[in-house]
């Protein structure tokens, strides 16, 4: 018997609808999402959830830095610093998932 996952299912549905109805290229879409995550002080899990699609769309570390620089005057330095920390925690999560025994 499968455990119901209504919250996860809803999140997947709204993300799919966003992608389906957007006219942006995958790269532009992921840059916009990154800017929004910085603006709302998204938690590390949000960055982690978007890491795969971001990498697949060609987003680079320089792109991430450029977006953070671009939004800093609008969202404030505290949110940009928080985003940097949350990105680092997301990276740590990804490493832990990829190598749970820490053998890499």
Q: What feature does the model see in each segment?
A:
Residues 1-31, 39-41, 45-56, 80-104:
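Acidic, glycine/proline-rich low-complexity segments that act as flexible tails and inter-domain linkers
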Residues 65-89:
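C-terminal structural segments of small proteins and small subunits
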Residues 30-41, 65-74:
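An amphipathic alpha-helical micro-motif enriched in hydrophobic residues
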Residues 53-57, 70-73:
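Short basic/hydrophobic patches in alpha-helices and adjacent helix-turn junctions
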Residues 59-64:
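Winged helix-turn-helix DNA-binding recognition segment
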């Amino acid at each position: 018997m499968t455990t119901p996952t209504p919250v996860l299912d809803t999140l997947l549905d709204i993300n799919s609808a966003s992608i389906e109805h957007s006219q942006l290229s995958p790269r532009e879409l992921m840059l916009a999402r990154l800017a929004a995550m910085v603006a709302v002080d998204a938690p590390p899990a949000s960055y982690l959830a978007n890491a795969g699609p971001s990498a697949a769309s060609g987003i680079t570390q320089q792109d991430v830095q450029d977006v953070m620089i671009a939004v800093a005057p609008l969202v404030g330095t505290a949110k940009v610093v928080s985003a940097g920390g949350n990105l680092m925690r997301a990276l740590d999560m990804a490493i832990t998932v990829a190598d749970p025994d820490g053998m890499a």
